[in-house]
């Protein structure tokens, strides 16, 4: 693939922040001195997000935008992965809760690794205590069942060599479990995975129903565990 960097942000009803945050990302990427693009993937948005995203794509030649009617960041992730022009693929959250320095750090780490995990556990995080406890419990069980040593499986602040995960695009969970799947598949294939510290600050309440998300992710985790027993 062409050397360079694709940054992907899944978006859902982000009319209040989409334009300004996309411009911030583009300004940051321009300072890195590498070929780059930004892909914005609206999934299920019912506000003006699709119109704003389409206008950003018209304004900037290095922005791609798409909208799918069904909500599901994993569904958007898979589509963005197929659209990516460059050999390195980094994911961010729409609210930019992670320090964007992760992008440059991931870009460097992907020279020697197939995946890069931005880890709040290794860095710093300003989040409600109940969210930290819930996340840590899920991470602990993930590592126990899948025999993995990592400390963060959130959607944002992750990086991949595009070629390492593109073969799995058709199997990506449509919703919020795809990070675990991608990391598991890279590790299973013998790929190299780096974990680096990130700074994270919650800028708003979660956009997901946390109780529903808990049941969903635990169900998906046990499903992946059962499949891993057959691998």
Where are the regions a protein language model picked out?
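Short aromatic/hydrophobic "clamp" motif used to bind/position activated sugar donors
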Residues: 89
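Catalytic metal- and UDP-sugar-binding loop of GT-A-like glycosyltransferases, i.e.
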Residues: 92-94
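Acceptor/aglycone-binding surface of glycosyltransferases and processive sugar-polymer synthases
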Residues: 68-83, 100-176, 203-212, 218-219
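Hydrophobic helical membrane-anchoring modules
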Residues: 1-4, 16, 20, 145-148, ...
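Conserved donor nucleotide-binding strand/loop of the catalytic core
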Residues: 36-39, 50-83
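Donor nucleotide-sugar binding loop of glycosyltransferases
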Residues: 14-17, 45, 73, 99
């Amino acid at each position: 693939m062409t050397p360079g960097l694709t940054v992907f942000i899944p978006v859902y009803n982000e009319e209040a922040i989409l334009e300004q945050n996309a411009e911030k990302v583009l300004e940051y990427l321009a300072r890195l001195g590498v070929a780059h693009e930004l892909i914005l993937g609206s999934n299920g948005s019912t506000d003006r997000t699709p119109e704003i995203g389409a206008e950003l794509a018209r304004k900037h030649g290095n922005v791609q935008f798409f909208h799918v009617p069904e909500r599901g960041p994993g569904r958007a992730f898979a589509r963005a992965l197929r659209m990516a022009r460059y050999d390195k693929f980094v994911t961010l959250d729409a609210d930019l809760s992670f320090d964007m320095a992760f992008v440059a750090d991931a870009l460097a780490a992907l020279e020697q690794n197939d995946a890069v995990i931005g880890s709040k556990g290794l860095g710093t995080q300003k989040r409600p205590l109940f969210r930290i406890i819930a996340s840590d419990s899920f991470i602990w069980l993930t590592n126990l069942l899948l025999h993995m040593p990592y400390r963060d499986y959130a959607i944002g602040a992750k990086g991949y060599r595009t070629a390492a995960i593109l073969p799995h695009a058709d199997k990506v969970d449509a919703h919020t479990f795809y990070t675990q799947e991608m990391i598991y598949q890279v590790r299973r294939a013998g790929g190299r995975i780096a974990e680096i510290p990130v700074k994270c600050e919650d800028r708003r309440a979660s956009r997901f129903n946390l109780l529903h998300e808990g049941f969903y992710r635990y169900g998906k985790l046990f499903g992946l565990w059962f499949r891993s027993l057959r691998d």
